[in-house]
C-alpha cells in the first residue's frame, strides 16, 4: 500500500476482489517489494476474505471503511464441493505459481495464507470489521456457528492445499480478531479450530506461522496450537514473550515507528533484535505497513536488520 508502483496499479483497479483474481497483477504486486528491498520472503497479494467470497458470500471493500459482506446462504453450501470452490478463486493459485517460479524468489520463501476460522466466522456473521467488540447476540445461534466452523475447516484445508501445491512453502494463519474473545472462549473458537489447520499444514510438511492478534496468553496458545512460529503484535511485550515461550517468534515492531525518523527507527528495531538475539526470531512488523510510510524508511529498516550483528 505504501509503494508508488502499487498505488499506480490500484488506482486503475478499483474492485479489490477483481484485483486479487487477476493472476498477472496480483503476482506483480507480490513481487514489487522484492524488487526494491533485500527481503527473505514474499507473501502473496490476496486477502483472507477470498474464502467467504469463494463460498458465495458477496464481499466488497469500501474506501475508508473496510470490507462489507452480504449474507452467506448456508443451505447452498451443503451441495458446494471442492471443484466449485477452487474454480472461483483459481487465479489466486495461478498467481502463487507465477511468484514461486520467479527468479526473484530463488532461495527465498513464498508465503501463502488464510484467515483463522474464528476471524472468518466474525466477518461472515458480523458482515464487517467488528472494530473493538462483537455484537451481543453473536453467539445466540450455536448450531449455525458450529456448522459454519465445520465448513470453514473443510474449505480452509482445500485452500491451504492448493496454495502449497502451487508453490507456497510457508503458510501463515491470521487470527485478526482473536483478541475479542474472553479467555474462557478461546479453546472452542481459537485453539481447537486453529490446531486442526496447524496439524493439517504440518501433515503436508510445510511450516506454519500463526498470528493470534490481541491475545494476552501466548504461552497457552503455543502449548495448545503448536505453530512452528508465532507472530506477535506491537502491543505485546517482547521481553515477556522471551521469558514465557520457547517457540520461534515473528514480528512485534509498531508500524508507526516507520513514520518517525531514522534514528528512532534504528533504536526500536535494534531493541527487538537485542531482546531476541538468543531466541529463534524472524524480524517483522507487528501489523501491516501503513500507506503513508516512505519506501526510504523501509529500505533503511531492512538494511538495519541485515547489518545487525
Feature map (PLM): residue ranges:
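Conserved, mostly hydrophobic/aromatic
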Residues: 34, 99, 156, 163, ...
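Active-site mouth loops of central-metabolism enzymes
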Residues: 12-26, 133-158, 254-264
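N-terminal basic, low-complexity leaders that serve as flexible interaction/assembly modules and, when applicable
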Residues: 1-61, 105, 296-309
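Glycine-rich, proline-tolerant flexible connector loops at the mouths of alpha/beta enzymes
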Residues: 41-63, 78-85, 168-187, 286, ...
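Short glycine-enriched loops at secondary-structure junctions
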Residues: 1-2, 47-49, 65, 114-129, ...
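Alpha-helix-loop-beta-strand connector modules within alpha/beta enzyme cores
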Residues: 90-107, 184-206, 243-247, 301-309
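Active-site-proximal, glycine-rich beta->alpha crossover segments in alpha/beta enzymes
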Residues: 56, 60-162
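Catalytic-face loop-and-helix region of soluble metabolic enzyme cores
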Residues: 3, 202-309
Amino acid at each position: 500500500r505504501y509503494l508508488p508502483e502499487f498505488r499506480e496499479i490500484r488506482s486503475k483497479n478499483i474492485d479489490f476482489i477483481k484485483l486479487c483474481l487477476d493472476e498477472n497483477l496480483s503476482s506483480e504486486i507480490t513481487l514489487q517489494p522484492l524488487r526494491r528491498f533485500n527481503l527473505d520472503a514474499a507473501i502473496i497479494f490476496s486477502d483472507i476474505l477470498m474464502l467467504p467470497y469463494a463460498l458465495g458470500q458477496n464481499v466488497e471493500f469500501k474506501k475508508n471503511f473496510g470490507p462489507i459482506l452480504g449474507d452467506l446462504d448456508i443451505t447452498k453450501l451443503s451441495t458446494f464441493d471442492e471443484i466449485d470452490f477452487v474454480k472461483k478463486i483459481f487465479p489466486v493459485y495461478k498467481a502463487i505459481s507465477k511468484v514461486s517460479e520467479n527468479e526473484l524468489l530463488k532461495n527465498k520463501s513464498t508465503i501463502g495464507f488464510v484467515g483463522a476460522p474464528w476471524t472468518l466466522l466474525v466477518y461472515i456473521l458480523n458482515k464487517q470489521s467488528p472494530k473493538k467488540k462483537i455484537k451481543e447476540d453473536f453467539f445466540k445461534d450455536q448450531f449455525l456457528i458450529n456448522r459454519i466452523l465445520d465448513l470453514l475447516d473443510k474449505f480452509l484445508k482445500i485452500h491451504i492445499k492448493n496454495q502449497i501445491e502451487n508453490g507456497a512453502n510457508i503458510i501463515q494463519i491470521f487470527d485478526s480478531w482473536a483478541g475479542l474473545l474472553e479467555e474462557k472462549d478461546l479453546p472452542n473458537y481459537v485453539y481447537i479450530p486453529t490446531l486442526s489447520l496447524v496439524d493439517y499444514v504440518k501433515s503436508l510438511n510445510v511450516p506454519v506461522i500463526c498470528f493470534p492478534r490481541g491475545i494476552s496468553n501466548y504461552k497457552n496458545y503455543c502449548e495448545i496450537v503448536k505453530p512452528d512460529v508465532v507472530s506477535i503484535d506491537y502491543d505485546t511485550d517482547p521481553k515477556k514473550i522471551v521469558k514465557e515461550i520457547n517457540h520461534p517468534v515473528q514480528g512485534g515492531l509498531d508500524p508507526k515507528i516507520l513514520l518517525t525518523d531514522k534514528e528512532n527507527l534504528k533504536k526500536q528495531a535494534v531493541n527487538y533484535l537485542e531482546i531476541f538475539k538468543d531466541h529463534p526470531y524472524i524480524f517483522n512488523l507487528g501489523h501491516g505497513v501503513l500507506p503513508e510510510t516512505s519506501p526510504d524508511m523501509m529500505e533503511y529498516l531492512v538494511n538495519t536488520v541485515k547489518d545487525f550483528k
